[in-house]
Design a protein with these regions (language model features):
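Glycine-rich phosphate/pyrophosphate-binding loop shared by adenosine-nucleotide-utilizing enzymes
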Residues: 5, 64-68, 156
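Conserved catalytic-core motifs of GNAT/GCN5-like acyltransferases
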Residues: 70-73, 120-123, 135, 140-157, ...
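Conserved acetyl-CoA-binding loop-helix of GNAT-fold acetyltransferases
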Residues: 96-110, 132-136
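Conserved beta-strand-loop-alpha-helix junction that forms the acyl-donor binding cleft
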Residues: 95, 121-131
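Helix-loop element at the rim of GNAT/NAT acetyltransferase active sites that forms part
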Residues: 20-37
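Conserved GNAT acetyl-CoA-binding A-motif
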Residues: 111-123
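Acetyl-CoA-dependent GNAT
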Residues: 35-93, 104-105, 164-165
Length: 177
């Protein structure tokens, strides 16, 4: 990345910034169905959990965290273990700057190195920015849950998409790394 931007693995020291980026999405939008913003301590736990089994990356601009992306479990059944659910969040005003793409590219590289094959992403509709980003990154629509979540006095649909992280043409490794 250029212009004073850097993508790196997240750590507990990024929890305050990640919590601050996420809070407006929780309180002011239906983009996430969480109803209470996580505390920095809760965010630190999420970062640690993702780092253990998947990945969590942050985008720094001029030494300050302005976005993050992470992978987590898709479903708990063993057959799904090579698939993961991914999300990306950027500080307000940072959309359409290439940060989301850069975060996902770095995330997919780390997930591929751990043996993951497929990424799944859900997005509350309408959300043109997220739909456009995921489409541009090769995510394909696989279905929409209609009126699945109630937030801010309205029902919301969630579109689900998926894309390969690595080719799924062979048998998966015995274990994830």
């Amino acid at each position: 990345m250029s212009g004073g931007q850097l993508i790196r693995d997240a750590s507990a020291r990024d929890a305050d910034a990640c919590a601050a980026i996420y809070a407006p999405y929780v309180t002011g939008t239906a983009i996430t169905f969480e109803s209470d913003p996580p505390s920095p301590a809760q965010m630190a736990e999420r970062i640690a959990a993702a780092a253990r089994e998947h990945a969590w990356v942050v985008l720094e601009a001029d030494g300050r965290v302005v976005g993050y992306a992470y992978g987590g479990p898709y479903k708990s059944r063993a057959a799904y273990r090579w698939s993961c659910e991914v999300s990306v969040y950027l500080e307000r005003g940072r959309r359409r700057t290439g940060g989301g793409r850069a975060l996902y590219d770095a995330l997919f590289s780390r997930l591929a190195a751990r043996g993951f094959r497929t990424a799944v992403a859900g997005m509350t509709l309408p959300n043109e920015a997220s739909v456009g980003l995921h489409r541009a990154l090769g995510f394909e629509p696989v279905g929409t849950y209609r009126r699945i979540g109630w937030k801010h006095g309205a029902w919301h649909d969630v579109a689900w998409t998926q894309r390969p992280i690595t080719p799924n043409t062979d048998e998966p490794p015995d274990d994830l790394r």
